[in-house]
Amino acid sequence: MLRVHRLYSTRGAAEVLHAAPKYALRCGLEIHTQLNTRNKLFSLSTNDPFQAAATPNYHTSFFDISLPGTQPRLNYEAVLYAIKLSLALDCRVNLKSQFDRKHYFYGDQPLGYQITQHYNPIAKDGKLCLYGAYDNIPEDEKTIGIIQLQLEQDTGRSLYKDTDGMTLIDLNRSNVPLVEMVTQPDFTDVKQVRAFVKKYQNLVRHLNISTGDLETGAMRVDVNMSVNGHARVELKNLPNTSSITNAIRYEYQRQVDIIRSGQADKMLKDVETRGWTGSATIKLRSKESTIDYRYMPDPEIPVLLLEPEVVHRVATALPELPDQTLRKLMAEPYNLSLKDAKILTTNSNSHGNFYTHHDLRNYFMKTFQLFTAKTGASNSKLPANWIIHELLGIINKLEIPLPKILQLLPASHFAEFLALIHDNELSKSSAKLLLFHIINDFKESHCSNLALPDFRLLIEQYNLNPLNEVEEHALTELCQYVLRELNDDALVADLVSGKKKNALKFLLGKGMRLSQGKVDPALLEGAFKSVLGIKW
């Protein structure tokens, strides 16, 4: 029943978001991002909160567990990572910032306060632009303002399951460096929120400052939203993108229903924090129970002063940002589709350790340049099709890391392979078989045989030379054989009439397999049409 209720609630809310302009959504985000520095923010403990999960409290120092007399020592690598992200988000980096104490009591915060940057954060006044063409939002362009970025320490983890009623505390995560980013309430549509989260996630991965994983807590998103200017509601416990969007949809519908019932002045007058159960939002606390954090400057940490030269050097070393790369790949000379360009610019972490988008993109661009120089085919789709689709398919199937493939098939060698296809010295179907054979043999040698394959020798060895000149009667006999073996008059009739035009591809596939990929597909298609008398 819960499953049915969740689907009904979120779908209904989605419809209202698009169909109820009288009920204006305003939404802002707070995103906490763990930085993958070598050490923690204020100690020399190893920053490894997840891989050490099997050994609680393993990566901890005296400061992490708050032994009396220990003092914080700022990790400047975290400062540089924060500057890097600030510049990528077009923020104004403050040359003078400070750390403050945010006081509250909880078991996973042994200090009794969190060290953060409340009054003078490291950066302010940034933005991230979303585009209809790239980010799947209704508008052509939407700019989301960023209020500030601040450095702060993470808390430990409280564990409740299978503990006989006890709460266990793991401090491996305590004092891990975080950047908290706070946006302006500029979101007016749930699609904008989804696009922003995905874009920000890809950005921190692209900058190599965080894994950006929502499921592990390396990136955590809180939502602040209101409808028609009523009191703000904060949404927490949002472990993934679908939870974020579904919670917003559900809460939007809940508030719209309250407004329609005339109860808004009573039920939406106070700031409220609500959690997401997976099917509904539930009240956690209201304004009356809001915590007074008693912020104060941390007397043990000096004011952070940055030289302008430091910011300039970080800006100079900043890599090309994903949107810039996307535009480049979709323009001359590459002319990639949006889907293919995103494969080369989006680091989804779903491919494990097989490849990174950075390495894959560099391999594609280098291969493209060498292939173009070799063949003069400036607008060819061959490099994109064979690297993004065929080669990646083999990498994922055989589970071979791209760096190993680059040793076997460097860009210059793969460009030569593509040139053989371009010059009709190797058919596409034979090329697929040959490429898989080469890489599979490489895997079976435990990736130790690094001799560059001789493509022409292999083509001769396996008799893969294409049949460029085939007598018409031979093609006719091949088509007739395929049709006899198929023995499906109804399908053939639908094909000839045009009801099932895709059936021709089915016949072509059978014919190509019988010819071992040696026949030109265009010639074979013409032969089938001639044999069947197809007029369309």
Curated annotation (Swiss-Prot):
UniProt GO BP? glutaminyl-tRNAGln biosynthesis via transamidation; mitochondrial translation
Q: Name one GO cellular component term.
A: glutamyl-tRNA(Gln) amidotransferase complex
Is Secreted among the key words of this record? no
Cell location: Mitochondrion
Looking at the record's lineage, which domain of life comes first?
Eukaryota
Instruction: Cite the PROSITE patterns for this sequence.
Output: GATB (PS01234)
Sequence similarity? Belongs to the GatB/GatE family. GatB subfamily.
Summary of the function given for this chain in its UniProt record: Allows the formation of correctly charged Gln-tRNA(Gln) through the transamidation of misacylated Glu-tRNA(Gln) in the mitochondria. The reaction takes place in the presence of glutamine and ATP through an activated gamma-phospho-Glu-tRNA(Gln).
Q: What is this protein called?
A: Glutamyl-tRNA(Gln) amidotransferase subunit B, mitochondrial
Q: Which organism is it from?
A: Eremothecium gossypii (strain ATCC 10895 / CBS 109.51 / FGSC 9923 / NRRL Y-1056) (Yeast)
